[in-house]
Amino acid sequence: MKQYKQIIENYFKKHSLVESIRYPGLKSHPHYEVGLKQHKGPGGMITFEVEGGIEAGKILMNSVHLCQLAVSLGGVETLIQHPASMTHFSMGKEARLAGGITDGLVRLSVGIEKVDDLIADLEQALEKVKEAHLVEETV
């Protein structure tokens, strides 16, 4: 399971539409050192920022096939959530941003599916974000 998260994290680091990754297993995470002392591992929750804002987050979330749409994240299957259009929708944008909930933020709770299948599913969903022309192409 740990290697799955590492493979997905590495995939996100290389993808042009993923602007940032928040994962307690990253040394750059502000609570990385505390996590080493308190937990056996950083867990399966990976949060990433997809370029293109709310529409990009919705397209990604609605385009994956293996991930289950979830408001609450927990279980053995991979779950996906777009907070700006789901759990935090009723908050004003300023309040969401103050809490670190940006428009393109997506939460992914990695389950037990085959990692290659998850990567392929995320890739085809991110391709749909690109096809929606919500972000500028870079040369």
Regions found by a protein language model. Give the residues of each.
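Electropositive phosphate-/nucleotide-binding environments in soluble metabolic enzymes
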Residues: 2, 6, 40, 54, ...
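Glycine-rich beta-alpha junction loops
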Residues: 2-4, 25-29, 50-52, 75-80, ...
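Conserved small-domain helix->loop->beta segment predominantly found in fold-type I
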Residues: 6-65, 71, 91-97, 134-139
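PLP-dependent enzyme catalytic core of the Aspartate aminotransferase-like
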Residues: 73, 78-139
